[in-house]
Curated annotation (Swiss-Prot):
Protein family (similarity comment): Belongs to the UppP family.
Organism: Enterobacter sp. (strain 638)
More about this protein: Bacitracin is thought to be involved in the inhibition of peptidoglycan synthesis by sequestering undecaprenyl diphosphate, thereby reducing the pool of lipid carrier available.
Protein name listed in UniProt: Undecaprenyl-diphosphatase
InterPro entries: UppP
GO biological process: cell wall organization; peptidoglycan biosynthetic process; regulation of cell shape; response to antibiotic
Amino acid sequence: MSDMHSLLVAAILGVVEGLTEFLPVSSTGHMIIVGHLLGFEGETAKTFEVVIQLGSILAVVVMFWRRLFGLIGIHFGRPPQHEGEGKGRLTLIHILLGMVPAVVLGLIFHDAIKSLFNPINVMYALVVGGVLLIAAELLKPKEPKAPGLDDMTYRQAFMIGCFQCLALWPGFSRSGATISGGMLMGVSRYAASEFSFLLAVPMMMGATALDLYKSYHFLTAADFPMFAVGFVTAFLVALVAIKTFLQLIKRISFIPFAIYRFIVAAAVYVVFF
């Protein structure tokens, strides 16, 4: 792969990662399809995908830095001082409770989960995840018990963490699982989305660190320009995607995202079978 071609591939995949990582549509499904169409597959491709996820994580940190800073401050007894830090009722305990189920299962079944990274499993996950999105819209309480982040209970945070375990199934979508779970637990669509983004920071950083530790030997100095382009592109696109998504869900339901997932599942079938 020539230098210019590899940089173009990196930019395209960075756009795909940034657009889909935090939408309930499965970034994994999109990366598998696009990577296959571009001829970019194998161990280097898997490591590349892990690295550019860091760009998406950085976008969340930039978008929610006040809230994240506020969570840390509250833990050390510092009251909220800015509107963006919330009212002080969402704490690191909520985040921890949301992390525990998936962390435990992810560590226990890490190798088994990696063996599921193939088109057929991703295709099924896209469909089941789409059904869950529809179920969340149809079965959620008419009036949310937790309209805002600061209204969430520890139980709701833990149950969202349990739903997050579904995202260990490649193609399911971490944001789709957590947001759907939040809505079914009585959290508003917007608050569930915000919590999903906040939860993504420690979860994705931990998962990325573990994957990099296990695959760092596939990295070479020659790969740095390609990885850097993918990282920066994913970061910039994710910034726009997160902001747009949070505005969009104030006006529409998740039904269109579910339908889109079914279309992507059909595309996986056409491309790979």
